[in-house]
From Swiss-Prot:
It comes from Aster yellows witches'-broom phytoplasma (strain AYWB). Residues 11-193 form the tr-type G domain. It is found in: Cell membrane. This is Elongation factor 4. HAMAP family: LepA. The lineage of its organism: Bacteria, Bacillati, Mycoplasmatota, Mollicutes, Acholeplasmatales.
Amino acid sequence: MNIEQLKERQKCIRNFSIIAHIDHGKSTLADRILEFTGTIDKRIMKEQILDSMDLERERGITIKLNAVEINYQSKDGKNYIMHLIDTPGHVDFSYEVSRSLAACEGALLIIDASQGIQAQTLANVYLAVENNLTLIPVLNKVDLPSADVPKVKEEIKETLGLDPEKALIASGKTGLGVIDILEQIVTRISPPQGDIQKPLQALIFDSYFDSYKGVVPSIRIVNGTVKKGDQIRFMASNSVYEVVEVGVYNPKQIVKDFLAPGDVGYITAAIKSINHVRVGDTITSQTNQALLPLLGYKQMNSVVFCGLYPVETNKYDILKEALEKLKLNDSSLIFEPESSNALGLGFRTGFLGLLHMEIIQERISREFGVEVIATAPSVIYHVYSTKGEKFLVDNPSKLPSTQMIDRIEEPFIKATIMCPEIYIGKVMKLSQNKRGALQNIEYIDSQRVMINYLLPFSEIIYSYFDKLKSLTKGYASFDYEIDKYRVSKLQKMDILLNGEIVDALSLIVHHDFAYERGKAICETLKEFIPKQMFEIPIQAALGKKIIARQTIKAMRKDVTAKLYGGDVTRKKKLLEKQKKGKKKMKTLGKVQLPQKAFLAILATK
C-alpha cells in the first residue's frame, strides 16, 4: 500500500472498548457482535469467546482485557476495520479498564435495563471522560420481564449527564440492536489520529509469555509503521530487538504484513527477558527514533498485601517463575522474597484487591501447578516513631515495639454504595460496625439510593463486600477509591501456640475490636488444630498482655490398661511417669499448623 492508501485505510478504522458494571452482559453482547460480523465461525462459537481463561468462564467474569479485530460493511457499503477491546467489570480490575481505554477513541457503556446504573458504571464513566472518549450508552437485557427502559434512561440523564435519547436498546441474549450499535460506532466514534510518516510510536497495553515466541507485547500503533525485519527499541528498558512477526487478534493471532496508525495487534521479536517489556512503555524504531515516549498509564499501586508460601517447600523457584510470568500481563502485581519461621521461604505479594488476590492464587495453582498458603491480607500502614521517623509497614511482623511508636496512620477509602431504599438501615449498620463515617445519602429515584461512606480500608478487605451482598439480597453495588491516611488506635496482635509466637498469624487490629478478633481466632484454631499428646494453649496477645485464650486438651493414652488386680501404688507410679513425659513433650513439642487452619482464620475475620 502507498501512503495515500494507508491514510484512506486509517479513516476507516474504529477503536472501541466495552465497559460495564460486573454482570451487566458485556461479554455476551461482545459475542453477538463477533457472531453478527462473521468474525467468529458459528461452529467454533462458545459463550464468553473473548474470555480466554477457564477461570473467567467458570466464574462468569472477565479478568483480563482482550482485543479482537472485526471487519464490518456498513449500510452505506463502506468497509470498516474495528478493534474491540473487552474489559473487566469488577472494581479490582479497573486498572485493566484504564489500559484498554488508552488504546481506544470510544466506548460502549453497557447498562443492565433491569438493574440500572450501578457503582462501577459511574467509575467507568469517569475513566472514559478522563481519556476523552466518545461514550455510547447501550441498554442491555431489554428482553427481561424486569427491564425498565424509561426509568434507566432517566438515570442516564440525571446521574451520568448523558443524552438519554442517544442511548441504544439491545439484548446480548437475542442479538437485538447489534446492527444499530455497529452503525453508531461508525458514525459517532472518530477514526484514530496519527501520522504514518512520523517515527514509529507504539503503546504496549498488555503482554504475555509464549514458550515458543517469548514475550509477546500487545500494541496500539499511534504513529509510523512496523513490519517483519524492523529493528525496534523499547524506550523504557532501552533494549533493541528485530521484529519476527506482526499481526492482529481475531481473537486468535492472524499474521499481517505490517501494522499502521490506529492498528491494534501484537509483535513478536524472540524476547526472552521478561524485564525488557513493560506495560505502558513505548516501542520506537531503532533507525528512526521518536524523541519522546507516549504518555503511558498512571501506575496502579497495590493496596492489599499478603505472604504467599509454597505448600511444598521445594517448589519455591517454580512459584518465583510463576509470579514473574503473571506480572508480564498484570503489571499491578508486585512481589518480593520474604521468610517466615512457621512457613519457610515465600513472597510478600501486593494486589489491587481481594478478588485480584484470589484470582492470582488460583492461576498459580492451575497454570503452574503450585499450591500456595496465603497469610492474612493487610494494607500499608504509616508508622511514626517517637524520634519522628516514618516507616511504611505492610507486614504486621515488621511493626516496631509499642514503646517506639508515636502514632499509626491507616488508609481510608471513599465508598459508594448503591442499593434499594429499604436496605439503608442494614447498610448503615454494617458500615458503622466497620468503623465507617457516613458522608452523604442521595436518592437516585424513589426506590434507589446512593450512600457515601468513609471507611478504613483494612476493614473492607475482610468480608465487607460479601456481607453487604447478603444483607441486601444481592441488590447492592459497591465501588471505592483510596482517600488519604488518618490516625487510628491500632496495635499489633500476636497469636501464640504453646507459648511461641506464630509470625504468620500476627495482625494489626483496632484497639476497640482486639478482644473479639483475638477470641474468634483462638476459637477457630482450637477447632482446626489436631490434638497432641500434650496440652496446647492458644493465646492472643497485645504486647505482653494476653487478651484471649483457648486450650486444646491432650490426648490421653491409657497407661494402666495392662495392670490387673488392685495394686494402686503401681497405678500411681505409671500415671506420674506419664505426667512427667507429657511435661517434657510440652517443652520440646512443636505444634504443626495445618493449611485449613490458615484458611479458616481468614474466613473468621
